[in-house]
Amino acid sequence: MAENNLIQIYVTGGTFDKEYNFVNGQLFFRDTHLPQILELGRCSLNIDIKTLMMVDSLEMTDSDREIIIHNCAKSQARQILITHGTDTMVITAKAIAEAKIENKTIVLTGAMIPYAFGSSSDGFFNLGSALSFVQTLKVGVYIIMNGRYFEWNKVKKNTKTGFFEDIE
């Protein structure tokens, strides 16, 4: 039986969760920052966080996407939020939509600037927006970025501006 008020969050990596190595200037993964972000935001939602992988989305494979799809399909939650790198977020959203997972609202969000960079990160805003949208949008697959929601097949990332935009 589905827990209708549960929001399942799947962590997949992306800039959202990258750390900065002050010695060599490289970005790397350690652990997700979601528990700290939710605590800072005084979040009172019923949330379960599960890390599926920690990868840069440019390195995400079809096998990684199958893991995401499998977890979305088997989840008891009807509301699923996926943190994901922005470069291939639309590709993953397409794969999820084409899997035809029924009766679930699935949203993907990410960040252009790592949470570890502090208040300059857009991750706080995107996560909060995604948590709101996953509770209010109808069943389907969506990208949530920059305070907006986009249907999975009507969005692209503008690589010049770093913003997500509607497509016809």
Model segments located where?
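Active-site histidine-anchored catalytic micro-motif
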Residues: 2-168
